Curated annotation (Swiss-Prot):
Molecular-function GO terms, alphabetical: structural constituent of ribosome
Lineage summary: Bacteria, Bacillati, Cyanobacteriota, Cyanophyceae, Synechococcales
Region (Disordered) location: 87-122
InterPro entries assigned to the protein according to its UniProt record, in alphabetical order: Ribosomal_bS16, Ribosomal_bS16_CS, Ribosomal_bS16_dom_sf
Keyword terms: Ribonucleoprotein, Ribosomal protein
Protein name (record): Small ribosomal subunit protein bS16
PROSITE patterns for this protein: RIBOSOMAL_S16
GO cellular component: cytoplasm; small ribosomal subunit
Length: 122
């Protein structure tokens, strides 16, 4: 399988990265199949070969998480909702529903407590 990943180069503590297409079993800094772009995290400079990237993505290349975020910022792929975000939103929705049910139960219990008290006094 072909992966789109970042290949590190530069001096110590001054890293820059090349965006490359390579086999998933190859080393991080091994020989790539194709160089597709450049990213410098210090200056936030990004250069992408959009035609080559679209071709590789259409062929089924899988980007790593870091590359995926660069491609999303570059507008080459749509932002995807990651499973953790989906689970978090689902749990939030369940908590809201459970909270609404608890509030309704408490209101019903409060009315039930008030009603028998009124009947015994009358």
């Amino acid at each position: 399988m072909i992966k789109l990943r970042l290949k590190r180069f530069g001096k110590k503590r001054e890293a820059s990265f090349r965006l490359v297409a390579c086999n998933s079993t190859s080393r991080r800094d091994g020989r790539p199949l194709q160089e597709l772009g450049f990213y410098n995290p210090r200056t936030k400079e990004t250069r992408l070969d959009t035609e080559a990237l679209r071709l590789r993505l259409s062929q089924g290349a899988q980007p790593t998480d870091a590359v995926r975020s660069l491609l999303e910022k570059g507008g080459l792929i749509e932002k995807t909702v990651r499973p953790a975000e989906v689970v978090g939103k689902a749990k939030q929705a369940e908590a809201r529903k459970a909270g609404a049910k608890n509030v309704a139960k408490q209101a019903a219990e409060a009315k039930a407590e008030e009603t028998p008290a009124d009947n015994t006094e009358a």
